[in-house]
Amino acid sequence: GWTEWTQGFQFGSAILQFDATDDEQFLEIGRRNTIERMAPHVSHIGVHDHGFNNVSTYGNLRRLMLEDRISMDERERDFYDLALKVSGAVQASRWSTTADGSGYVYSFNGPHSLFCDTIRSMRSLSMAHQLGHSLMDENDGSVSLLDRMIQHARSTAKYNVYYGEGRDSYDVRGRVAHESIFNCNDGRYRCPSTQQGFSPFSTWTRGLAWIIAGYPEQLEFLQTVSDEILDSLGGRDEVEDMMLNAARA
């Protein structure tokens, strides 16, 4: 069922429990279940949850190995790397374009739906990019995962986050709409919506937390990306200002 997206938390939390306590039983729980039960999440084309699921499991195991918290095994690390590369590309393939020439990774509701949650799955695109991967598309076209991450971050900041600048009568600085709805035929923005919040015109607090956590994650990641690469994507100043404004709103 759709609630299986929480398996990333379930097994990832065991890995973090080991990280905090050095209790080997939690490492065993997290590692075994990641290997035995997380593969469907890596290739899942129907959700926006790759960051929650795969970075929380494969990503944390890889991190612990690189930090010498667990023994280094090159083949095991290759396994984690492959999972993270595939996850980022699969997540990036779930793409809708917008009328302003940008786009977003759409939610499990369908191509019309941009969730604020998904900013925290941009981790999967960023990690896959950092590992040298891209999304291969029709006619062997190579799609930059970094580009898609930044486009998604821009769209979320533009449509889901409110800045108190008079956008509409509900534009209160710091308000976050859980969901933005688009016309799939022409990519035009239609209205705010909500999957789990009280209403489209209130703030879903958990969604606000995703914004507050998700943008700083990407700001930290951007410190590993060269100015030269970012120049073709709007420039470091513009990209970082956009993310910082969204996180602070």
Each language-model region and where it sits:
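Glycan-recognition and catalytic cores of secretory/periplasmic carbohydrate-active enzymes
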Residues: G1-A249
